[in-house]
């Protein structure tokens, strides 16, 4: 198993990923979520970091945001749809939505022209709008966002080559552009907390597990670039300054009981209120006061031939732009969890856990749990053979693609603000 931001190889063991990457199982927070998305209920979203911040903000009706992006290296497909659905759901749950088109990454890492990245990027934008993204979303191309590029420059001062080499495996042959893209992506994630967008707030980033190195680096950078750090102490919070003890003097007028030391200040009271007050002062004196971003991790969408669905492997995916009949044909050729013969399938039953078609049902095509459970039971009991199952899925894919593409055609971009 090899999982990096640019390559996924081998059989993925998600429980092992949770352990290796230091995530938390999403099942632990699922009971706290009102009306969870089917991707949450059905286990497509398997891990998280600090999603409790988002749940608390939802429950208290406090500001929060959802942010994710798409590298326009090929046509949008069902793997991208998973992230799009998560963004749309979080927006409907009260989050401010930020959608990045990672044209700088596509240009520097994949070698696409700026013209091609824009052409493809607009297809991603129309697709997520067709899936329900509302007009109040912030949509932008990385190369055209001064907020992102300026913040990336600031963040790049906080990281060096040795660290990038350890995280990403960069070497002397790695281009400077590819290295700088890591700062751009960190800025994508953190810029919803800039003052121009309402200041510090919880932000959740729905991603695949291959993007976790970006999240770990970004969480570290959020702490490094902020002036104040927080540590729990009995009855309150210990506040330190990363930029010099003189900054602590700006906290002297806070209306909490406190003890002032040479290198830190202990402030007593409810931790959340203290941290909010300190962050407010940090912004007032010119700091960033970033809250470490939260993240959710979804399973990789299995390609039609096995392995990860990838824009760089056209044979592996159903594009959201495929002609409906073509999409249906691809389903009929997809890898399934069936047995070698129909007789063996009737006797032993199918294996939906290994089936690309059942995955399409679970994560994209069937909303009804009762209907999905019936298909699974009939498959396992050998009563539903792969040929019939594929035909059912092919019709659903054809219907979805037809409706989705009609919605894309009807998208009125004049109702949206697109930076770029």
From Swiss-Prot:
Renumbered ranges of motif 'HIGH' region: 72-80
The reaction(s) this protein catalyses: tRNA(Trp) + L-tryptophan + ATP = L-tryptophyl-tRNA(Trp) + AMP + diphosphate + H(+)
Assigned EC number: 6.1.1.2
EC category name: ligase
Domain of life according to the entry: Archaea
GO annotation, cellular component aspect: cytoplasm
InterPro entries for the chain: aa-tRNA-synth_Ic (IPR002305), Rossmann-like_a/b/a_fold (IPR014729), Trp-tRNA-ligase (IPR002306), Tryptophan-tRNA-ligase_arc (IPR020653)
Principal place of residence: cytoplasm
Gene Ontology MF term list: ATP binding; tryptophan-tRNA ligase activity
Motif 'KMSKS' region: positions: 308-312
SUPFAM superfamilies xref list: Nucleotidylyl transferase
Keyword set, alphabetical order: Aminoacyl-tRNA synthetase, ATP-binding, Cytoplasm, Ligase, Nucleotide-binding, Protein biosynthesis
GO biological process: tryptophanyl-tRNA aminoacylation
Cross-referenced NCBIfam families: PRK12285.1-3
Identification of the protein by name: Tryptophan--tRNA ligase
Native species: Archaeoglobus fulgidus (strain ATCC 49558 / DSM 4304 / JCM 9628 / NBRC 100126 / VC-16)
